[in-house]
Amino acid sequence: YKQDAMNEWGSIVALTYMAAQRSFPDYNDMADNKAYLESIARSFGYFFGTEKKVRVNTISQSPTPTTAGSGVKGFDGFIAYAEKMSPLGNATAQDCADYTVSLFSDLTRRVTMQNLFHDGGFSNVGVSNAVMEKFMEE
């Protein structure tokens, strides 16, 4: 940040995952690092905001097949579970790219220091009918 590389009203966006706030099996170190990333975004959001009016946000994306994610034991289960829990279904990588572009636009000029969930509603659902059906006796 000391290099003065950002233009005024610029935007910085990082990708994270809700495991930064919740427990997910076998996501241990990655979850710790995502929590740290979200904290850095808040800290730098304040610094860059006051110095250059630069916005700093994180996007908490649906579980998405990536090189990093493929190394997490049971990751396919995360994807299937989130799909069953999300009213709108999982957001794809392309959906995330489109959403990210909006954070670089002037339409989000006053959005900063936020962790924005982009997960089809998964982060706010306690339990879905699709998941409950798995536990119901027939």
Q: What kind of feature is each model-predicted range?
A:
Residues 11, 67, 105-108:
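Short linear Ser/Thr-Pro motifs
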Residues 58, 76-111, 116-120:
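C-terminal helical subdomain
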Residues 18, 26-27, 70-72, 115-116, ...:
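Short amphipathic alpha-helical segments
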Residues 2-50, 61-65, 89, 122:
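Catalytic loop of short-chain dehydrogenase/reductase
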Residues 51, 61-86, 95, 126-138:
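A glycine/serine/threonine-rich, flexible loop-to-helix segment
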Residues 1, 45, 49, 73, ...:
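Generic helix-packing signal
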Residues 108-111, 115-138:
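C-terminal tail/cap regions
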Residues 9, 53-55, 111-113:
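Short, small/polar-rich loop/turn modules that mediate ligand/substrate recognition or access, typified
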